Amino acid sequence: MFRLRRILGIILVLAIIAAGTFVVLDVLNSEAANGKPADPSEQNKDDPTEEPVIVKPEKPEILDHTVGLYTGRGSWDVDLVALRNFLADHDIEYVEIDQETISSGDLNQLCDILILVGGFSAEYLNHIENHANIRTFVESGGCFVGFCAGAYYACSTMRWEGNAYDYPLELFTGEGAGPHLKWGSLAAINLNPEISFHSDFPDAVEMWYFGGPCFTGYDKSNVDILARYNANDEAAVIAFNYGRGRVLLLGPHPELGYIPSKEQVQTDGSGGALWTWLYAALQWLVSEKPV
């Protein structure tokens, strides 16, 4: 009798264990059927079709415009190297244009943005024979960008060391005056917070100065002042509409870096160059063209 009770007790225990195992297996099967594995760490382990979600950073907007880079008489070779590097670094397509092409070529077919670099504005004046061709380009919807000498060239009056000279391009009906800082100075620049893309930059930056103009004597209602020199509070960078096009003029050089101790200009984006700001300025320029 005792042995029979013992056997019946063992059978009862085994039945209870079997029933519990059945319940657990039923729960697991139910979760699997509903797509919920019991162990989250096992999710996707044996299912090659399920891939983890990768969040990629948003790419910056591409400046999808062709630049015409003036490389003719008067252009500063060092500045040309810097701008070629800048354009290549930002995957911006460009063509090189000499004084003959800029005078007689169909610029609107060649490029969307025409850049005149630093150098010698008097050489631009004397060796570009047809200044009206540039005006036609901008009036027809092109963008003109002038750095330093290129900015002087665009002004109706160029003032150098107190002496005034009339210039014929006259995109800007005002005066470009300089120099007002020592060549090779790191100029303190105050950015205008009302310019939309400046929300991504501090209010004050520094740009290298190599004799460029400040801009005076103009109708301020028609001109966007992007930046001012901290030293005299005069306009350092301006932009405005011209016909169906747009003009950007810069006194300082955001495209260049400089090592004063070596008197060495940097052309690779180092040494205090502000390539990020310059790229944003070009994007803003083309986006603000008249409709």
Model-predicted regions and their roles:
Residues 185-258:
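Catalytic beta-strand/loop cores that center a nucleophilic Ser/Cys/Thr
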Residues 1-14:
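N-terminal Sec-pathway targeting helices
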Residues 22-35:
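Hydrophobic single-pass membrane-insertion segments
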Residues 155-201:
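Class I SAM-dependent methyltransferase SAM-binding "motif I" and its flanking Rossmann-like core
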Residues 39, 44, 48, 53-55, ...:
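Extracellular ligand-binding/catalytic regions of CAZymes and related secreted enzymes
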Residues 123, 153-156, 161-163, 234-236, ...:
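Short catalytic/ligand-binding loop motif for oxyanion handling, primarily in non-cytosolic enzymes
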Residues 19-24, 47-70, 76, 85-88:
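Mature N-terminal, pre-catalytic/accessory segment of carbohydrate-active enzymes
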Residues 76-160:
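Helical hinge/lid and interdomain linker segments adjacent to catalytic or ligand-binding clefts
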